[in-house]
């Protein structure tokens, strides 16, 4: 049994619990939260959110998520909110993932550069291919990858099944194929100096994702959005074997709580050594080479 009151947590991907930043925006999306994530939508203040992270000894990187569907002028407003909150709670908000429609082109790249220049803490770029309707390997993302590679900041590319649109008519237009790990493989091959993190368990293509991780040394892995109870057997095994130095924790707060995830990880019977690697040591090693 792990003493979770002493475990440090480096959360590679969570969302905002505040009303302004909440990931699910429409009534239809919020109605799906109990079915898809087994939790209920509710809001907290920025201070309450920070106190929750602090209570669980967590450093967190947040993703507004919905900004990828907004015009760049509106995106700036939400980014300013995120950066200001990050500055105020630096001890628990390690950074922010910038989620921008790649079709914004040079204006979108300039926005990532603006956020990086704000010096609020870590800034990275996230690719939500399924939700934005553009797979990670599409040339529309190339200017963003080029900037990230030159600036030395990572790109987080989401893979596998997504809860976004799940259960809604037509999946809200989300094409799951845009989340196939082959898109990560393509980007990693074309940008060998780009630090890439694949995000989420990659079911139903988990073995393909494992193959990419074993083949491409510039690709790491974080596991937000799922309870470890539902990982494939191959992923469960590789976490303590060939991927033991490459896998990092992600929570997907507030859709998942730390309390639930700690209990579920505990039930998988990993050793203290492996859990420490997953929950903070691998992330600390990864970010030791990132300049921000």
Placement of each model-derived feature along the sequence:
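Mid-to-C-terminal alpha-helical segments outside catalytic/metal-binding sites
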Residues: 1-60, 243-248, 256-292
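Short aromatic-enriched loop/helix-cap "lid" or pocket-rim segments at secondary-structure transitions
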Residues: 20-26, 109, 167-170, 209-211, ...
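Active-site gating/metal-coordination segments in enzymes
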Residues: 59, 69-166
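Alpha-helical scaffolding within the catalytic cores
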Residues: 43-50, 78-83, 110-112, 180-184, ...
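Catalytic pocket-lining loop regions of alpha/beta-barrel enzymes
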Residues: 121-124, 129, 133-248
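Active-site environment of divalent metal-dependent phosphoester hydrolases
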Residues: 16-20, 68-71, 102-105, 161-165, ...
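A structural motif corresponding to the C-terminal end of an alpha-helix
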Residues: 52-61, 87-93, 151, 186-195
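Conserved, mostly hydrophobic/aromatic
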Residues: 13, 82, 115, 148, ...
């Amino acid at each position: 049994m792990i003493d979770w009151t002493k475990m440090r947590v480096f959360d590679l991907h969570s969302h905002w619990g505040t009303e302004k930043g909440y990931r699910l925006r429409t009534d239809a999306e919020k109605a799906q939260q109990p079915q898809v994530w087994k939790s209920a939508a509710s809001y907290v203040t920025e201070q309450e959110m920070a106190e929750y992270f602090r209570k669980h000894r967590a450093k967190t990187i947040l993703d507004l998520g919905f900004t990828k569907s907004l015009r760049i002028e509106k995106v700036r407003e939400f980014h300013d909110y995120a950066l200001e909150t990050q500055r105020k709670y630096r001890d628990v908000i390690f950074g922010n993932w910038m989620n921008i429609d790649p079709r914004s082109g040079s204006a979108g790249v300039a926005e990532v550069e603006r956020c990086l220049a704000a010096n609020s803490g870590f800034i990275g770029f996230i690719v939500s291919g399924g939700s934005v309707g553009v797979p990670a390997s599409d040339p529309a993302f190339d200017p963003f990858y080029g900037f990230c590679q030159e600036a030395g900041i990572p790109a987080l590319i989401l893979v596998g099944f997504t809860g976004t649109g799940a259960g809604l008519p037509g999946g809200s237009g989300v094409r799951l194929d845009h989340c196939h790990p082959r898109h990560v493989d393509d980007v990693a091959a074309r940008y060998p100096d780009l630090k890439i993190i694949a995000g989420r368990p990659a079911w139903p293509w988990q073995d393909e994702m494992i193959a990419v991780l074993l083949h491409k040394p510039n690709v790491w892995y974080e596991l937000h959005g799922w309870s470890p109870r539902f990982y494939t057997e191959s992923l469960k095994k590789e976490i303590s074997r060939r991927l033991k130095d490459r896998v990092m924790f992600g929570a997907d707060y507030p859709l998942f709580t730390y309390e639930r995830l700690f209990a579920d990880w505990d039930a998988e019977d990993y050793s203290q050594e492996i859990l420490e690697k997953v929950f903070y040591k691998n992330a600390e090693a990864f970010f030791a080479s990132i300049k921000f």
